[in-house]
Structures are given as structure tokens and as C-alpha cells.
From Swiss-Prot:
Lineage: Bacteria, Bacillati, Actinomycetota, Actinomycetes, Mycobacteriales
Annotated GO MF terms: DNA binding
Descriptive protein name: Putative transposase for insertion sequence element IS986/IS6110
Classification via SUPFAM superfamilies: Ribonuclease H-like
Alphabetical list of PANTHER family matching this protein: TRANSPOSASE INSF FOR INSERTION SEQUENCE IS3B-RELATED, TRANSPOSASE INSO FOR INSERTION SEQUENCE ELEMENT IS911B-RELATED
Disulphide bridges: none
Positions of the Integrase catalytic domain: 101-268
């Protein structure tokens, strides 16, 4: 059916509706939030972030506009094993038994390492994470998978807590798998010196160090895979520093009640300082 010229020109010259204007504004905010969070947020986290910023919008609206913009979240892939056990080295007992939900910070730290392929060779990355709020306390990027790398990561974790006034670490369990770096004499002596209790799960069982492997998986999915190709170990180190800062301070973590890890820790300490009711 032919359309009259006047009808066509009326359509293209009409003022945009209130919904169209609102959609245009929201598209800008949605694109900004998605880009600022490494492009990993799906509709739910974009919606939560907008509402945290005071931009009230329905989740279904965010879903509709993200579809129009061609934006989506990411899905974590399967982790690969990196640590290599030393069968000749004695190992501590497993004090965790797959219980990764401690009641407070500084009760359980989990650690693991992974690797990143670069044009200059492999970069090895070690993380130490407090299991209470999934906060990364220490990390290290190195060109070799040596004991010194995991020592540097635990030193940073200890330093992080010391800067916050936590000097007594006797309640901390440090849990890893049977990787030779974590069962070495040097590493074991450093844990003992700090008063930290060592705990070791099994190699080959992802469940025995599931939380640490989750952190590695998020790191690979959110930073490493989208950032390929990596030119140098230094590039990986700089990008990792930025990602850890975002992860701890801005990334909404569902386990934490959709707040960043540092916010959950702060809420824990604020609750303890609050006078008892009654």
C-alpha cells in the first residue's frame, strides 16, 4: 500500500517520544557501565550498577536496550591445572575440607597460580584471596614459576592486612593445592614466622581448592582472554594491577550480596563496632 509523501515526512520530522528520549539517555549510561567494567557485565549487573548510581531503571528495560546495543556479559571457561606437586615433599593436612565460607575476614586465605601466554614467553600469576569477601590481598606476576613468586604474593597479603592494623594472623589458614612452590621449605617457614596455619588440598581435584580456581577463572575470562594478544610480561603485570583494583573495589560480586569485596569487609567491621541493641 503506497504511503502519502506527507505521511512519510511527518514521520521523519516528528519529535522523539519521551520513551525514545529516555532510551537514548539510558543507552549512553548502559554503554558506559558495560565498558567501565571490562565488558563482562550482563544485564543484571548493569542494572544493579545503574541503580547504585541513582539511575532508577527496570531490569527488563536494561535487558531490552542491551539487546539493541548488542551488549552481553561473559561466561567463565574451564580452568586448567598449573601447579605441579613434588611427591618427595611432606605436605600439611587439609584443614579446610572444601569449606570456603568462613564467618569473618582473616580466617581463610586461599592461593593458587596460573599462567598467561605472551609474545615474550609465559607470565605466571599468583593470587592470595581472603575467602570471607573474596578480596584479593596479594598477587605477583613473574617470568618463572618459582617459590619466590608465591612468597611475594603472601608478603603482599600480609602487608595489606598490616596496613589495615591487622598484626595478629594466628587465626588465618592459608590453603593451597599440592604445588611444589607452596610446599617448599622456604614458603612453609614464612607461614610459620607469620603465625599462619598451612593447609593443602589434593592436586587434580578442583574441588579441594575451588575458590582459588574460581578467582583464576574470573581473571582469565575478564582480563586475559579479551586482552589477547599480550606482548610482554610487563603488560600483563600492569593490566593485572588495574584488574585487581577493580575487582576489589568496584566489581559487583554476587557471593558478596552484589557489592564489591571491600564493601562487604567494611560492613562486617562496621557491624562489629555497632552497639548491641537493648
Amino acid at each position: 500500500m503506497p504511503i502519502a509523501p506527507s505521511t512519510y515526512y511527518d514521520h521523519i520530522n516528528r519529535e522523539p517520544s519521551r520513551r525514545e528520549l529516555r532510551d537514548g539517555e539510558l543507552k549512553e549510561h548502559i554503554s558506559r557501565v558495560h565498558a567501565a567494567n571490562y565488558g563482562v557485565y550482563g544485564a543484571r549487573k548493569v542494572w544493579l550498577t545503574l541503580n547504585r548510581e541513582g539511575i532508577e531503571v527496570a531490569r527488563c528495560t536494561v535487558e531490552r536496550l542491551m539487546t539493541k546495543l548488542g551488549l552481553s556479559g561473559t561466561t567463565r571457561g574451564k580452568a586448567r591445572r598449573t601447579t605441579i606437586a613434588d611427591p618427595a615433599t611432606a605436605r600439611p593436612a587439609d584443614l579446610v575440607q572444601r569449606r570456603f565460607g568462613p564467618p569473618a575476614p582473616n580466617r581463610l586465605w586461599v592461593a593458587d597460580l596460573t599462567y598467561v601466554s605472551t609474545w615474550a614467553g609465559f607470565a605466571y600469576v599468583a593470587f592470595v584471596t581472603d575467602a570471607y569477601a573474596r578480596r584479593i590481598l596479594g598477587w605477583r606476576v613473574a617470568s618463572t614459576m618459582a617459590t619466590s613468586m608465591v612468597l611475594d604474593a603472601i608478603e603482599q597479603a600480609i602487608w595489606t592486612r598490616q596496613q589495615e592494623g591487622v598484626l595478629d594472623l594466628k587465626d588465618v589458614i592459608h590453603h593451597t593445592d599440592r604445588g611444589s612452590q607452596y610446599t617448599s621449605i622456604r614458603f612453609s617457614e614464612r607461614l610459620a614466622e607469620a603465625g599462619i596455619q598451612p593447609s593443602v588440598g589434593a592436586v587434580g581435584s578442583s574441588y579441594d581448592n575451588a575458590l582459588a580456581e574460581t578467582i583464576n577463572g574470573l581473571y582469565k575470562t575478564e582480563l586475559i582472554k579479551p586482552g589477547k594478544p599480550w606482548r610482554s610480561i610487563e603488560d600483563v603485570e600492569l593490566a593485572t594491577a588495574r584488574w585487581v583494583d577493580w575487582f576489589n573495589h568496584r566489581r559487583l560480586y554476587q557471593y558478596c550480596g552484589d557489592v564489591p569485596p571491600v564493601e562487604l569487609e567494611a560492613a562486617y567491621y562496621a557491624q562489629r563496632q555497632r552497639p548491641a541493641a537493648g
